[in-house]
């Protein structure tokens, strides 16, 4: 399980580090401990079989420390050393195409300009690894996507992202067990927004029997005189046929 983000205090609370947030919380929940491995240029934690994570085989948590656009090196080295296939790799990352509060699971597909995914795909020579996408929302007009993801989310956005992380964390043991399709079905069902309620139609008031409605007053009193013909105007608004 690879969490994507940028190392350093100045980045730890930015939208681009949503992948780090999930993997760090999963490590705590699983009782795993990260160690800095210079060989991978990453923080690495091992999940032993039969532990809290529920994995039947050994698994690893990875947080590359070489900045986002060079994330692929650590993934390539760990996958090569442990003979991991692309379909055995899950990359957790921020996603502009979904609003905060939404998490989606998919295998392969486009990378939508995400530099971390771009480097991983180039290093592995495939897009066929699994991806857990955490929605962070689209940038407002006039803001570049690259600048937006390096900013901190608002308090409400952060709360929504954390809620999506909670849902995904509950399904990670199922993912580690290999049931990606089952986990996907649950995740995509649970995070659908509730249907909008149609506004209630107001019923007209019930008339009391034998009660007449008050007559409506005329908006204007009609003049008995015939309507005057409009005055003719010439160029520049001057009146025609009118003596000074």
Show the residue positions of the predicted features.
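Active-site-adjacent loop and "lid" segments of alpha/beta metabolic enzymes
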Residues: 144-158
